[in-house]
């Protein structure tokens, strides 16, 4: 999701908007492609920065908008699904290949189950947060149409191309497939 004190529906709506980012190079690139001015800022400073106009908007998860009360200082939130937050479990390949096959299989199964479980919790928390934000009446939620999503994807396509060189096309293709994106 992304927010501001104006609707962010079309890529042109971002022109000149100061948007708080966490420092992600990908976020920096795609916001610049939208015409925004990314501002790296600590998470703990975001509420006050939104309240005082140091930044015009930010991106975050629905649960963070609710718990951090960002919706109280932003008139408009776009439920955009423009970014995907993921975490990786990384293990040394020599260590991994040294484990017996049955142990690797059990660990993979446990990771799959843990991933499914935590994803279900995140989905529920975010759905509940959106309902609470809407119920508060303090901000307007905007949901993008398929055509609007396509316009965002087109505007951010150079970032997708750039990221291919960093993480590889197969990884991004898998992500696009999982998120049902047309890239």
Region locations from a protein language model:
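N-terminal secretory/targeting leader peptides
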Residues: 1-183
């Amino acid at each position: 999701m992304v927010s501001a004190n104006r609707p962010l529906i079309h890529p042109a709506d971002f022109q000149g908007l100061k948007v708080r980012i966490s420092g992600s190079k990908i976020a920096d690139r795609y916001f610049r492609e939208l015409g925004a001015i990314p501002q790296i800022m600590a998470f703990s400073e975001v509420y006050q920065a939104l309240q005082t106009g140091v930044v015009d908007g930010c991106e975050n998860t629905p649960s963070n908008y609710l718990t951090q009360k960002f919706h109280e200082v932003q008139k408009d939130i776009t439920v955009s699904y423009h970014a995907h937050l993921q975490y990786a479990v990384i293990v040394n390949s020599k260590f991994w290949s040294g484990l017996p096959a049955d142990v690797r299989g059990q660990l993979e199964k446990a990771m799959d189950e843990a991933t499914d479980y935590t994803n279900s919790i995140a989905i529920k928390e975010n759905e509940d947060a959106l309902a609470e934000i809407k119920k508060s009446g303090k901000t307007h939620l905007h949901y993008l149409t398929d055509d609007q999503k396509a316009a965002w994807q087109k505007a951010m396509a150079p970032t997708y191309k750039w990221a291919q060189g960093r993480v590889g096309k197969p990884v991004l293709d898998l992500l696009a497939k999982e998120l049902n994106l047309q890239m």
